[in-house]
Amino acid sequence: MLGHNQNVVYQVNNYFNEKVQHRKVRVTKTVQRIAKVVQEILKEVEAQEPRFINTLSETTTGRFDGIVVHSPSEYEAVLYLNQMGVFNFVDDGTIQGCAVLKLSDGRKRSMSLWVEFITASGYLSARKIRHRFQNIVAQVLQTPQFSDYCKLLQDNTDVRVRVDDKYTVQITCAFRCNGIWPRSASHWPIAGLPWPNAALANQTKAEGFDLTSRETAITQQNNPNKQASSMEADAWAMKMHGAENMLLTGGRRKTLSILKCLRDAHMDFPGTPVTNYILKTLVLYECEKHCSEYEWEDPNIGDRLVGILLQLVSCLQCRRCAHYFLPSLDLLRSKPVHSIEHSAQLAWHLVRKLMIDPNALQSL
């Protein structure tokens, strides 16, 4: 598949127009269903606890702000909370990929909308808010309105709902942080690289990030240091989907869409560590290696696919995949070794076929 010829262009476009577009149509229909269910749940949650306001909204193009697609069966809905203003955002790198919200000097607890979730040390606890939200959702799902087609999964402290016994949606509480950039990502963009250009880099930084209340690989581990464990549980995980998406347009986004489809068909199994997010991360790293726009045009997408999949194999063999913006955060941390090894075998089988078979995409 390596090389630049019309056969590669034909295969890439044919695969995109048939399989990728079919996947998009299927996912779009599922998102409509997921969004409808989540909005109904949040309506009942808000009736019990007015501070949890439904922020999920449909755009003029039919997309939903706040819905993230992890796979055709795994989704996430982000519920944005209000009134972060009385807290200072503290990102000192102590907790990988996370930051804490500390009551500002001179501010009283009573000035916060979330007063009962503030710890004795003055931190707004992500864990306490998540626990409260989970309890309310559990009560809502026990009502006849939802009990037939919704079930709360209680394998961890995240609010994860099984819908129609086919789809899983995680509902995540978050604060939106526009116009600021985390200290942990201060190294970006890397000096001397032509991509992204200065204007795009500034737009990306202005997009900011989300602080989310969720279980992380750190909080899932049994930490013998109770004080550290408590601090990590109270911390907020940084998510940078908006900033990442701003960087992926045109051929870069097309490449990612093809990779997602290949992942679903050839690397998906229960507990797989190869997520859409890891593929997105590797595409971003590939953008730094191939900065010119022409390198992401149709004649070169075959080479980009092979390069990214080879990098995936390398990450799986090393059992480490660094977050693009927050490199101290390992996206493969705490993943079972046997799952990583199996994924490495699947990824190598896939990329090997792409390299040796000039018509590989016709059969994949």
UniProtKB/Swiss-Prot annotation:
The keyword Lipoprotein does not apply. Induction: Transcription is repressed by heat shock. Keywords: Developmental protein, Differentiation. It holds the Pfam family Mab-21. The keyword NADP does not apply. Gene3D superfamilies: 1.10.1410.40, 3.30.460.90. Disruption phenotype: In the male tail, ray precursor cells show altered fates. Conical sensory ray 6 is absent as it appears to fuse with ray 4. Males show reduced body length and uncoordinated movement in a backwards locomotion. Hermaphrodites produce a reduced brood size due to a decreased number of laid eggs. GO terms for biological process: cell fate commitment; embryo development ending in birth or egg hatching; nematode male tail mating organ morphogenesis. Belongs to the mab-21 family. Acts in a cell autonomous fashion to specify the properties of the sensory ray and non-autonomously in the choice of hypodermal versus neuroblast cell fate. This is Protein male abnormal 21. It comes from Caenorhabditis elegans.
